[in-house]
């Protein structure tokens, strides 16, 4: 790392910022915290205000005071976290002021209701990608490129050793498996 640079390390990944650039997002024991919004993005522990990138269990955890997420993820979030959670469903691109920060959610193309979270304060724009997918997927809105000064990106399967079949090929394989023996019930497990 160059002299005069600070790094925000997040579970093995880092974002490098110049000394002149303040950190809009910082790592805390609860997760990624935006002090200007008084909110955590996909917190690891219960917090007063959570901004949720999508409804999968590794991003949306129970016990938070309030949740902000894309409206199309509401059903899954309430099923997983409880029907009585305090949830603020938002539309893609809709801007909300939380504290001293303008917050908006933009499609990540990962699953239904998945979002990148854009945070803007004092002329700086940071984006937390959450999980994202750039391939076409009829089950969700396509990935939306979002201009920013700093991008904090998920990279779980970003290494070159991971190569995936196209969604179309996976669908064909599932159909072939299912139609291979129609006399038997078929049960397909998936992660949510």
What residue ranges belong to the model's regions?
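His/Asp/Glu-rich metal-coordinating catalytic cores
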Residues: 17-45, 49, 55-191
């Amino acid at each position: 790392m160059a002299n005069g640079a600070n790094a925000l390390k997040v579970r093995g990944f880092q974002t490098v910022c110049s000394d002149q650039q303040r950190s809009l997002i910082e790592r805390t024991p609860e997760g990624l915290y935006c002090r200007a919004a008084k909110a955590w993005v996909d917190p690891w522990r219960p917090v007063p205000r959570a901004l949720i990138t999508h409804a999968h269990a590794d991003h949306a955890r129970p016990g938070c005071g309030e949740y902000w997420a894309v409206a199309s993820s509401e059903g899954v979030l309430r099923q997983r976290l409880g029907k009585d959670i305090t949830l603020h469903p938002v539309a893609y691109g809709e801007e909300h002021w939380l504290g001293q920060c303008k917050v908006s959610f933009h499609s990540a193309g990962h699953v239904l209701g998945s979002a990148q979270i854009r945070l803007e304060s004092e002329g700086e724009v940071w984006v937390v990608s959450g999980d994202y997918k750039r391939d076409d997927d009829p089950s969700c809105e396509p990935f939306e490129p979002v201009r920013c000064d700093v991008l904090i990106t998920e990279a779980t399967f970003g290494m070159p050793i991971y190569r995936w079949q196209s969604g179309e090929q996976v669908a064909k394989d599932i159909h072939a498996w299912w139609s291979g023996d129609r006399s038997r019930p078929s049960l397909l497990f998936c992660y949510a």
